[in-house]
């Protein structure tokens, strides 16, 4: 029963995503390309944040003399 409820909720979120982004008007292959690009950009942003944020945080801490 819990799996069915989770699936229904996930389907509802996907439907809302399609409506908000107006992807329901696209053909399936266009939707696939758009979703692939969106996931790629999001993955690159997460990776960039993971790699470069510690350097920026340390620079800020050094600037405010929190860390020597």
Swiss-Prot record:
Which residues are tagged with the site Within the serine palmitoyltransferase (SPT) complex, defines the length of the acyl chain-binding pocket, determining the acyl-CoA substrate preference? 25
Domain of life per record: Eukaryota
Keyword annotations = Endoplasmic reticulum, Lipid metabolism, Membrane, Sphingolipid metabolism, Transmembrane, Transmembrane helix
Location of the protein in the cell: Endoplasmic reticulum membrane
Q: Which GO terms describe its cellular component?
A: endoplasmic reticulum membrane; serine palmitoyltransferase complex
* Keyword hit for Transmembrane: yes
**What residue ranges lie in the Lumenal compartment?**
27-31
Q: What is this protein called?
A: Serine palmitoyltransferase small subunit A
The organism named in the record is Danio rerio (Zebrafish)
């Amino acid at each position: 029963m819990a799996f069915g409820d989770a699936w229904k909720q996930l389907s509802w979120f996907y439907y809302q995503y399609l409506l908000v982004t107006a992807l329901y008007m696209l053909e399936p292959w266009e939707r696939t390309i758009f979703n692939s690009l969106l996931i790629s950009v999001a993955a690159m942003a997460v990776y960039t944040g993971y790699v470069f944020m510690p350097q920026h945080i340390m620079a800020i801490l050094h600037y405010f003399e929190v860390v020597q």
